[in-house]
Amino acid sequence: MSLLTPDSGLLFWMIVSFGIVFVILSKYGFPVIVKAIEQRKAYIDNSLETARQANERLAHIQAEGEKMLAEAKEKQNAVLKEAFAEKERIIEEARKKAVSEAHLQIEEATRRIREEKEKAIREVRSEIADLSIAIAEKVMKEKIGRDKEQQQMIDRLLDEVSFSKS
């Protein structure tokens, strides 16, 4: 048991040596250790603050990116709607123009047909009149000598004219 209970002299020198070591450490060792711990703590705190700021900036940048993406999609939709409306307007305008041009062409064709018809009728009437005059001249030359036949022909022509007028 003597090993477990130290001598008083040994105890004294252990306390003195421990006190000297403690004084030396407290004067030279602990301040360096405490300073290193405080520097490490400051470095860690600074790193945490920098990381927090970086996370905030990243979140802000992500929010801006999402906002810009939403704006771009909105602009894209607006441009697509505008392009669709423009396409519809152009198609409608082209359709109206085509219908208008078709009506103009139909009217022009109708007018030309009418003119050609009137011209043909005039030509036919002119031909009929010329033929009638030629036939009348031949008939008149033949019958000019016979008074009775001439009178009958005049009466017959007058009757035909009066019937056609009624």
Curated annotation (Swiss-Prot):
InterPro entries: ATP_synth_B-like_membr_sf, ATP_synth_b/b'su_bac/chlpt, ATP_synth_F0_bsu_bac, ATP_synthase_B_chain. The keyword Transport applies. GO terms for molecular function: proton-transporting ATP synthase activity, rotational mechanism; proton-transporting ATPase activity, rotational mechanism. Keywords: ATP synthesis, Cell inner membrane, Cell membrane, CF(0), Hydrogen ion transport, Ion transport, Membrane, Transmembrane, Transmembrane helix, Transport. One of its GO terms (cellular component) is plasma membrane. It comes from the Bacteria. It is found in: Cell inner membrane. The chain crosses the membrane at residues 10-30. Pfam families: ATP-synt_B. It is a single-pass membrane protein. Belongs to the ATPase B chain family. F-type ATPases have 2 components, F(1) - the catalytic core - and F(0) - the membrane proton channel. F(1) has five subunits: alpha(3), beta(3), gamma(1), delta(1), epsilon(1). F(0) has three main subunits: a(1), b(2) and c(10-14). The alpha and beta chains form an alternating ring which encloses part of the gamma chain. F(1) is attached to F(0) by a central stalk formed by the gamma and epsilon chains, while a peripheral stalk is formed by the delta and b chains. F(1)F(0) ATP synthase produces ATP from ADP in the presence of a proton or sodium gradient. F-type ATPases consist of two structural domains, F(1) containing the extramembraneous catalytic core and F(0) containing the membrane proton channel, linked together by a central stalk and a peripheral stalk. During catalysis, ATP synthesis in the catalytic domain of F(1) is coupled via a rotary mechanism of the central stalk subunits to proton translocation. This is ATP synthase subunit b. The gene is atpF.
